[in-house]
Regions:
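Glycine-rich beta-strand-to-loop/alpha-helix junction loops that act as flexible
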Residues: 28-31, 64-73, 106-109
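Alpha-helix-loop-beta-strand connector modules within alpha/beta enzyme cores
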Residues: 46, 85-97
Length: 183
């Protein structure tokens, strides 16, 4: 990425490149954002930059591609009020002074619910009274930081054995050689 000073420099020199047409700005700033205050700060900053580019360089951005960083509910206890978040965000966009064509890149907020992660057990072991199941995937296949989110529970179902009662607790671990690869 580039910062606003670099954007200004590029826009100030755009006429030196007759075959280059700069349509707008692409902005991505993070993920798992649930705060309208944070989104407002970002939109205000973007709007102010677009206004400055118009006033200082007579450049009007036709397009703004915005990676919103909207959250995805990865865990059972995650609660996201999507109506409030998206409604508030739409209002913030409507309040912008500059009016580029806006394309939203929704990323994981929309893709996270579009599939399932399947894995299977490749090994099992017991170590000092703790049961471990090793699976053929790991934290490199899903966004789940075992150490950071250790108390959160991902959605889980066991295919083919739903009617058998669970009599033991097992730790499910990925195939990476890391103590943090706990699913």
């Amino acid at each position: 990425g580039i910062n606003s000073d670099e954007i200004e420099e590029i826009i100030s020199k755009r006429n030196a490149f007759e075959y280059l047409d700069i349509l707008g700005i692409q902005f991505f700033s993070g993920t798992q954002k649930t705060s309208l205050k944070k989104l407002k700060r970002e939109i205000d900053k973007l709007d102010n930059l677009l206004i400055l580019l118009k006033e200082k360089y007579d450049y009007t951005a036709e397009e703004l591609e915005y990676g919103t960083g909207f959250p995805a509910a990865y865990f059972k206890e995650d609660t996201i009020n999507e109506d409030e978040l998206i409604g508030g965000f739409a209002q913030l966009l409507n309040e912008m002074t500059s009016k580029p064509k806006i394309t939203l890149e929704l990323g994981r907020s929309i893709a996270a619910i579009c599939g399932k992660y399947y894995t299977h057990i490749v090994d099992k072991k017991c170590n000092k009274g703790e049961n471990y199941l090793l699976v053929d995937g790991g934290m490199n296949h899903i966004v789940y930081y075992g150490q950071h989110m250790a108390m959160k529970q991902p959605y889980l179902s066991v295919c083919g054995k739903e009617t058998e009662p669970c009599t033991e607790s097992w730790n499910i671990c990925g195939s990476l050689c890391s103590m943090n690869d706990i699913i």
